């Protein structure tokens, strides 16, 4: 886990997310506390648990993006789950343990990618030697003639040495051509490990995905690995062999051990739509998808051990970030025990016109910049006037006010409509510079302020 100060985390988040200072500060402090915990003595470290966060705010204001960005920033295993996908134990649907299994899978992928990067250069060298063998063909080593041994005949020895030198020269010549890309389109026959395994499915009331025992993995380990011959171009063979050799160089037991440790100590689980499992008002009979799910989630957030195919995983120090609009139910409608597991509560504000202007201008991945880059591939240079940016922001803001407020996601709809004609005609406009002005925006979006036409812009 990377070491960032809270201010540095907020500064990084500011590059992609506009406003919401309170939410950014909360997650920054939560991450810094994890770093502080790692510096504590082992006996005290176990006593410090993460301060889980619940974000309250309308859709499209940055709840999910904040969680995703911080996970990427500190290189922590991250998984996003929808609370509405889970049902109480015993009913059809995903059980809550699956969120921990998903987190471990994400951690394994992350650690494996890191290990593969470290062995890339070594794998390339081994793969190159293998590829040269396939191109020139493997030469069988000749057995020595017994008469040569008895009577010390030198001719065959010299012939073999000369042939060896010639072969070495040929290999170096091919190696140079490979590196220069001269043989890329040459078709070569290679032998690779067959990674496909027979499909085995077992149907239970939990569904095959929820089974703790992965039968395919078990049989893949028991059955001998088969080889298969493939005819592919050299550039493709290079990629296949490099990947296979890199896989052979990493120790999967070490990967799994590190992944479990990272998931337990650095993992972040983002539970979206948590307000949808809050019971509002009086409900008669069993509430399968609401209170039951809350009670099932409770032990995981509180800290328990979940069995995964990689081994047992403790959830005591996983950071949970929950989010919801809470426009129907309230946070207080969650069961008290669950509320107590989220000590940090943050309210995110709805976006204003000024926020929309900043969203279009400031982030590194702003939509305006995305459309500029997309059209640059066609040879078109797009520029915006300040008045045009303000007009786009105003249209998005007013549509949100007149219809369903979907936050910053509304900008996707407006920008797509704005660039519809330009994107369609782009291949014929190569080499031109297009300036998006206020008049152009008003012309393309002239119906957007008419409340009878607003439905066109609703996602």
From Swiss-Prot:
The name this protein goes by in its record: ATP-dependent protease ATPase subunit HslU
Membrane spanning stretches: none
UniProt subunit comment: A double ring-shaped homohexamer of HslV is capped on each side by a ring-shaped HslU homohexamer. The assembly of the HslU/HslV complex is dependent on binding of ATP.
A Gene Ontology term for the protein's cellular component: HslUV protease complex
Protein task: ATPase subunit of a proteasome-like degradation complex; this subunit has chaperone activity. The binding of ATP and its subsequent hydrolysis by HslU are essential for unfolding of protein substrates subsequently hydrolyzed by HslV. HslU recognizes the N-terminal part of its protein substrates and unfolds these before they are guided to HslV for hydrolysis.
Cellular compartment(s): Cytoplasm
Positions bound to ATP: 18, 60-65, 272, 337, 409
InterPro entries given in the database record: AAA+_ATPase (IPR003593), ATP-dep_Clp_protease_ClpX (IPR050052), ATPase_AAA_core (IPR003959), Clp_ATPase_C (IPR019489), HslU (IPR004491), P-loop_NTPase (IPR027417)
Family: Belongs to the ClpX chaperone family. HslU subfamily.
Keywords: ATP-binding, Chaperone, Cytoplasm, Nucleotide-binding, Stress response
Pfam families: AAA (PF00004), AAA_2 (PF07724), ClpB_D2-small (PF10431)
Organism classification: Bacteria, Bacillati, Bacillota, Clostridia, Thermoanaerobacterales
UniProt GO BP: protein unfolding; proteolysis involved in protein catabolic process
Keyword Cytoplasm annotated: yes
Gene this protein is translated from: hslU
GO molecular function, one term: ATP hydrolysis activity
Listed SMART domains: AAA (SM00382), ClpB_D2-small (SM01086)
């Amino acid at each position: 886990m990377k070491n960032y100060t809270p201010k540095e985390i907020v500064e990084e988040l500011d590059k992609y997310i506009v406003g919401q200072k309170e939410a950014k500060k909360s997650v920054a402090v939560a991450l810094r506390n994890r770093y502080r915990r790692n510096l504590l003595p082992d006996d005290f470290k176990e006593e410090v648990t993460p301060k889980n966060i619940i974000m309250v705010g309308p859709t499209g204001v940055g709840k999910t993006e904040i969680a995703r960005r911080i996970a990427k920033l500190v290189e922590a295993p991250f998984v996003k789950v929808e609370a509405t996908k889970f049902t109480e134990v015993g009913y059809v649907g995903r059980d809550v343990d699956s969120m921990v299994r998903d987190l471990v899978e994400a951690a394994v992928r992350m650690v494996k990618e890191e290990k593969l990067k470290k062995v890339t250069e070594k794998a390339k060298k081994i793969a190159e030697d293998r590829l040269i063998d396939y191109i020139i063909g493997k030469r069988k080593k000749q057995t020595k003639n017994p008469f040569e041994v008895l009577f010390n005949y030198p001719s065959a020895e010299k012939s073999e040495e000369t042939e060896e030198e010639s072969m070495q020269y040929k290999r170096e010549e091919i190696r140079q051509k490979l590196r220069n890309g001269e043989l890329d389109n040459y078709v070569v026959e290679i032998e690779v490990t067959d990674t496909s395994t027979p499909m085995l499915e077992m149907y239970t009331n939990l569904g095959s995905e929820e089974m703790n025992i992965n039968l395919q993995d078990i049989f893949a380990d028991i059955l001998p690995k088969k080889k298969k011959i493939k005819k592919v171009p050299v550039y493709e063979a290079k990629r296949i062999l490099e990947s296979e050799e890199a896989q052979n160089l990493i120790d999967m037991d070490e990967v799994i051990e590190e992944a479990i440790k990272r998931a337990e100590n650095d993992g972040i689980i983002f539970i979206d739509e948590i307000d949808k499992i809050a019971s509002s008002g009086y409900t008669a009979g069993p509430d399968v998808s609401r209170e039951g799910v809350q009670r099932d989630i409770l032990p995981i957030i509180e800290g328990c051990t979940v069995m995964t195919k990689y081994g047992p995983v403790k959830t005591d120090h996983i950071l949970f970030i929950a989010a919801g609009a809470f426009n129907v139910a309230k946070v207080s409608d969650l069961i008290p025990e669950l509320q107590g597991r989220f000590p940090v509560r943050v309210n995110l504000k709805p976006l204003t016109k000024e926020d929309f202007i900043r969203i279009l201008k400031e982030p590194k991945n702003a939509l305006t910049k995305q459309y500029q880059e997309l059209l640059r591939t066609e040879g078109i240079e797009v520029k915006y006037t300040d008045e045009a940016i303000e007009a786009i922001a105003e249209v998005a803001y007013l549509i949100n006010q007149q219809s369903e407020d979907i936050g910053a996601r509304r900008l996707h709809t407006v920008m797509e409509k704005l660039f519809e004609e330009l994107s369609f005609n782009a291949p014929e406009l190569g080499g031109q510079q297009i300036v998006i002005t206020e008049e152009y925006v008003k012309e393309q979006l002239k119906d957007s302020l008419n409340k009878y036409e607003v439905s066109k812009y609703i996602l």
